[in-house]
Amino acid sequence: MLKIKEITIHNIALPLQETIRMSKVIIEKSNSILVKVKSTDDMSGWGEAASSLSMTGESSAGMILALEYIKNEIINKEIESVGEIYELIQRSIYGNYAAKSAIEVALVDLLAKTQKK
């Protein structure tokens, strides 16, 4: 079992080696949100999701707001299984699929590390 102690959210923008042109959209950088989840035993898990209003409908700012909301629902929770992670995140907020995936991947990464899988 793991207990969530801390969740940090990082907003990054990485320049692309080549510009992507899609319809009326030109993409020159990759905007992503990185999520680090730390347990009470100081182990960490990481997750990431890209933000793109033109592809996913989610902006970095919106993802950060959603993650701050989800974060408050998860801090100090005890988690034993991937199923619990999924249920906890799905119940926390409607929509916001990219934001949810970033924190879900971080939690699954952390759970796997604590279970040595």
Where are these regions (language model features)?
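Structured beta-strand/loop patches that form or line metal/cofactor-binding pockets in enzymes
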Residues: M1-S44, A50-S54
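Metal- or metallocofactor-binding catalytic centers and their adjacent structured scaffolds
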Residues: E6, K38-T114
